[in-house]
Amino acid sequence: MEEENATLLTEFVLTGFLYQPQWKIPLFLAFLVIYLITIMGNLGLIAVIWKDPHLHIPMYLLLGNLAFVDAWISSTVTPKMLNNFLAKSKMISLSECKIQFFSIAIGVTTECFLLATMAYDRYVAICKPLLYPAIMTNGLCIRLLILSYIAGILHALIHEGFLFRLTFCNSNIVHHIYCDTIPLSKISCTDSSINFLMVFIFSGSIQVFSIVTILISYTFVLFTVLEKKSDKGVRKAFSTCGAHLFSVCLYYGPLLLMYVGPASPQADGQNMVEPLFYTVIIPLLNPIIYSLRNKQVIVSFIKMLKRNVKVSY
């Protein structure tokens, strides 16, 4: 009888933000604009890198893939959020929930490894400039990209597997903006302590590994930059690395709070700021952060616009 009751709940309510009814339309329009800018910004960055052969080097291949993952994460979360602003029902089926979580888990994990790889790329470029073409080849870059996506899929499969063992019989209210393993584990009538443990072990390990890689890489970069006697070289190095460091700080802060800090059944799980930040705000900011501080991207973008204008006339 208990098992039958446990299988009854196959739909969930994503509460999302708690807001007054009069804020429904303004919030919908605000997030719609954010989403459109995010998609145009990231796809535009991908198009610029794709069209310009001069940008077919590791630094920009990594940047293009970061833009792809950001668009992926945003497109997994925002459309459902927009629908919930206008829909009378905020229901999502269990199968949709699992698919959404799986997609987000792949994107978030892949981005962690991409940011670490980008830090290593900058380390080699600045600390070993003469060896950079021999070390950081396009072939190595592509292999690192493939490994990042494979790691993202494997990590998502682990949590997805543990998610399948959960049953839901008491509550179907998910206090989150999307389906995630932590809020789902909190409402499960199955013992979910192993799910929280897996989040702490695997998500924590991935974040620690990527953060340590980034910190070590930029520590060497900092010492190398400080040894430079050329002011122009110092400015160029800080300009190149500053955007990446800023993006890293914005990305890992919410993730650490989300996946390492509250990994316990006692956490209330109702803070929407962290997931909103790394699924909506970061994908919006990344193309702006990287493009505005990168002269080559700006020049290539202007050239692409000029070519398109000539073709249209």
From Swiss-Prot:
Q: GO MF annotations for this entry?
A: G protein-coupled receptor activity; odorant binding; olfactory receptor activity
Q: Which cysteines are joined by disulfide bonds?
A: 97-179
What is this entry's stated membrane topology? Multi-pass membrane protein
Q: Which Pfam families match?
A: 7tm_4 (PF13853)
User: Which regions face the Cytoplasmic side of the membrane?
Assistant: 50-56, 120-143, 217-240, 293-313
Provide the transmembrane region boundaries. 29-49, 57-77, 99-119, 144-164, 196-216, 241-261, 272-292
InterPro entries membership: GPCR_Rhodpsn, GPCR_Rhodpsn_7TM, Olfact_rcpt
Subcellular location as annotated: Cell membrane
Keyword Protein transport on entry? no
Residues with attached carbohydrate: 5
Nucleotide-binding among keywords: no
Arranged from A to Z, the UniProt key words for this protein are: Cell membrane, Disulfide bond, G-protein coupled receptor, Glycoprotein, Membrane, Olfaction, Receptor, Sensory transduction, Transducer, Transmembrane, Transmembrane helix
- Which residues are exposed on the Extracellular face of the membrane? 1-28, 78-98, 165-195, 262-271
Which PANTHER family did the record assign? OLFACTORY RECEPTOR
Query: What name is this protein filed under?
Result: Olfactory receptor 5H15
Q: Which organism is it from?
A: Homo sapiens (Human)
- Cite the source lineage: Eukaryota, Metazoa, Chordata, Craniata, Vertebrata
Q: Which gene encodes it?
A: OR5H15
